[in-house]
A protein has these predicted regions:
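RecB-family 4Fe-4S metal-dependent nuclease core
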Residues: 1-222
Length: 222
């Protein structure tokens, strides 16, 4: 973890234990505990100027271009990145962001979720990162994520002629909260359907591309 939202900083210490406590999601109205595991590629953190709030960004590195889409989250797909982000920000995991003195932050809030992948080289042959995702529309957060003013690591955001930032990657705190609700609803609905015996296949180019049993499934993707 870094003490800023600058991905050029040092990563977390491999000798430390950063295991997350799971966020419980109840399926239907039964006492069914859903445990979803995974490994986060990168976590960046920023201690706000108020001294009480920690903001978190998660970064998922991809070998090829990968677009962030709110629609895919609403369609119960592509939820992994947001699941990491909101699990990190849950009260159960606040101890991960304790100060050296042991003091815990009053709040741990989501700042950004980013897919990063290599893109075409520029004219000088340097590899340019391709990034998509969301970032909180807050000057303090944007400045922390963009300390050298290059916009290299801001997802789908650009600086306008007036000096302000624009782009589809910007979102406010209310939309972040809405995304968390959408995410938990998607997980809950999918789990409830599975426990009720419904396990219909949902073919798509993305869902079936790496499936190990697609040859025997009978699904035809055009």
């Amino acid at each position: 973890m870094t003490l800023s939202l600058d991905p050029d900083g040092d990563g977390y210490d491999d000798d430390e234990d950063y295991s997350l406590l799971p966020t419980r999601v109840d399926a239907d109205r039964r006492a069914v505990k859903l445990l979803l595991g995974g490994r986060i590629d990168r976590v960046d953190m920023y201690r706000a100027e108020d001294g009480e709030t920690v903001y978190v960004r998660v970064v998922d590195y991809k070998s090829s271009k990968h677009d962030f889409s709110v629609k895919s989250v609403k369609d119960d797909m592509n939820i992994q990145l947001l699941l990491y982000l909101f699990t990190l920000c849950s009260p159960e995991n606040r101890a991960l962001f304790a100060e050296e003195s042991g003091g815990l932050p009053t709040r741990v809030l989501p700042a950004s979720a980013v897919y990063m992948s290599p893109d075409e080289s520029d004219r000088m042959g340097a590899l340019l990162p391709c990034r998509t995702g969301i970032v909180l529309e807050d000057p303090e957060i944007i400045n922390a994520a963009n300390p050298d003013d290059t916009q290299t690591y801001l997802p789908s955001v650009r600086r306008g002629k007036d000096g302000g930032f624009t782009g589809k990657g910007l979102c406010n705190a209310a939309f972040m909260a809405e995304l968390e609700t959408i995410l938990h609803t998607a997980i809950r609905d999918t789990a409830a359907a599975m426990y009720s015996g419904c396990a219909d296949r949902t073919p798509s180019d993305d869902a079936c591309k790496y499936c190990r049993i697609k040859a025997s499934c009978g699904v035809s993707i055009t």
